Amino acid sequence: MDWPHSLLFLLAISIFLAPSHPRNTKGKRKGQGRPSPLAPGPHQVPLDLVSRVKPYARMEEYERNLGEMVAQLRNSSEPAKKKCEVNLQLWLSNKRSLSPWGYSINHDPSRIPADLPEARCLCLGCVNPFTMQEDRSMVSVPVFSQVPVRRRLCPQPPRPGPCRQRVVMETIAVGCTCIF
């Protein structure tokens, strides 16, 4: 890299890393005023509309969205394709990926929600973007994420008592990606 480019790079880095302190019109530092909920400081978590919603409302909405996706999977008129192909005409990212995937329903009656959509890779290899054919020099692997679910905890039959629920994190395949 020649020296003008090096100098420009150094200047850009120094501007980016320089501490920024707000100043008032006289050039003095502003005092520590009351923190604004819209402008978080270095030790504050930004407050947005989502974080102001009560946690149970977000969980209900999350479960409703999962239920809608499961209903769409059950009611889908499209046959479950198990073919390794990319369809660039579709807007769904799982069908346009170089490691396409489909969804199946993961059912567990002791879980709330009992049904979760789970990704399954449609290819052993990955789709070559130049030939649009499966290339087995790479491998399609599922991408996992942890999702919150509620588990029903009921006492065993000799012990009477009501069932309880506990929120736990469950690992679910959410998509597929290519690896070498």
UniProtKB/Swiss-Prot annotation:
Residues 22-44 are annotated as: Disordered. It is found in: Secreted. GO terms for molecular function: cytokine activity; signaling receptor binding. GO terms for cellular component: extracellular space. Gene3D superfamilies: Cystine-knot cytokines. SUPFAM superfamilies: Cystine-knot cytokines. Disulfide bonds join 121-176, 126-178. InterPro entries: Cystine-knot_cytokine, IL-17_chr, IL-17_fam. Keywords: Cytokine, Disulfide bond, Glycoprotein, Secreted, Signal. Belongs to the IL-17 family. Stimulates the release of tumor necrosis factor alpha and IL-1-beta from the monocytic cell line THP-1. This is Interleukin-17B. It comes from Mus musculus (Mouse).
